[in-house]
């Protein structure tokens, strides 16, 4: 019965004429189903997704299987609940960074493209050095999918971007390598749309998976250190400021942008940079200037500040979230 209902689509490994690793396809073209053969055993199930969720913890054979077989099971993973969330979140951030460069439906009013365009123009304008000057080395902590790294590269000798999220860093590294902007946008529910666009990234960049609270660089390595939307996404925000201070050379530039979206699952309220009487933007400024938590030894001069810079994250076609970021540019004192 199996022989009558399926046919061999792709053979990856066989022995003595017996299929050990292969993909089988439903013989009826209207069906469209694909079934794997793993260790010589065909897996022919209607509800492959449910079976995979139950079996994957014990199915160690997949890890050593041919790439095509691993890709098949990766596809099952992506269609599951966790996979949908992960794909959606990744697409959300790629869209925020590169949405203006793709051919895709634009946001409905009042969520205009101009909002995010203005956000990037603002932060790039703040980062831009004085006329005719260039940074030697710049660093973007929590670089996500890389837009700010590429922007900094236009007026830096080298820019390093680090982030803990491997998938996000992979998007940025692939964009630099292939010069192709291709990603999935979630439309609704399980429906995703593949979108493409034109983006020519600078090549004087390096992307690493690393911890912003324990970065792998010696002190004083950078002329500019930035952290966008990261301060409220680390367990100890003050430690992030300390690392930025340490990584900057004397006279270097710090760039921060944050909507202060404090969450108890990330940082204990005792770590939040605010008090009951001093709001977060004022508190952060005073900390950098050495007027609060003076034992940190921070000695920065705030050169530019914007307290409510709007930006938008697209969750899917019917969910758009507006944030207001506090952006601050500060210069480290010279000893």
Task: Pin down the residues of each PLM region.
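A short glycine-rich, Lys/Arg-flanked "PGG" loop and its adjoining helix->strand segment in the class I
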Residues: 238-250
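Conserved Class I S-adenosyl-L-methionine
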Residues: 267-305
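A short acidic, Gly/Pro-enriched loop at the edge of an enzyme's catalytic core
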Residues: 210-225
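Conserved beta-strand signature within the Rossmann-like core of class I S-adenosyl-L-methionine
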Residues: 251-259
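Conserved alpha-helix/loop element of class I SAM-dependent methyltransferases that forms part
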Residues: 96, 100-135
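Conserved SAM/SAH-binding beta-strand->alpha-helix loop
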Residues: 165
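S-adenosyl-L-methionine
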Residues: 174-212
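Conserved class I S-adenosyl-L-methionine
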Residues: 134-144, 160
């Amino acid at each position: 019965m199996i022989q009558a209902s399926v046919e061999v689509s792709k053979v990856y490994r066989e022995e003595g004429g017996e299929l050990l690793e292969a993909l089988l396809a439903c013989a009826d073209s209207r069906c469209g189903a694909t079934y794997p053969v793993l260790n010589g055993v065909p897996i022919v199930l209607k509800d492959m997704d449910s079976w995979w969720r139950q079996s994957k913890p014990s199915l160690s054979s997949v890890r050593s299987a041919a790439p095509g077989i691993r890709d098949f099971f990766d596809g099952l993973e992506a269609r599951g609940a966790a996979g949908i969330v992960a794909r959606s979140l990744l697409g959300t951030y790629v869209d925020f960074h590169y949405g203006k460069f793709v051919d895709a439906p634009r946001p409905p009013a009042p969520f205009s493209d101009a909002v995010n365009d203005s956000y990037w123009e603002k932060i790039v304008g703040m980062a831009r050095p004085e006329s005719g000057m260039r940074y030697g080395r710049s660093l973007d902590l929590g670089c996500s999918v890389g837009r700010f790294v590429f922007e900094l590269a236009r007026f830096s000798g080298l820019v390093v971007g680090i982030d803990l999220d491997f998938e996000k860093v992979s998007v940025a590294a692939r964009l630099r390598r292939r010069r192709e902007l291709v990603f999935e946008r979630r439309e609704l529910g399980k429906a995703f749309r593949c979108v493409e666009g034109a983006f020519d990234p600078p090549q004087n960049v390096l992307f690493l998976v690393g911890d912003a609270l324990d970065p792998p660089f010696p002190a004083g390595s950078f002329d500019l250190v930035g952290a966008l939307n990261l301060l409220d996404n680390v367990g100890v925000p003050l430690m992030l400021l300390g690392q930025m201070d340490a990584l900057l050379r004397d006279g270097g530039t710090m760039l921060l942008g944050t909507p202060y979206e404090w969450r108890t699952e990330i940082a204990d309220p005792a770590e939040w940079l605010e008090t009951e009487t001093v709001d977060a933007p004022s508190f952060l400024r005073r900390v950098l200037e050495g007027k609060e938590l003076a034992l940190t030894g921070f000695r920065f001069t705030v050169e530019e500040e914007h307290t409510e810079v709007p930006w938008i994250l697209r969750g899917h076609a019917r969910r758009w979230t507006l944030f207001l970021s506090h952006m601050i540019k500060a210069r480290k004192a010279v000893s």
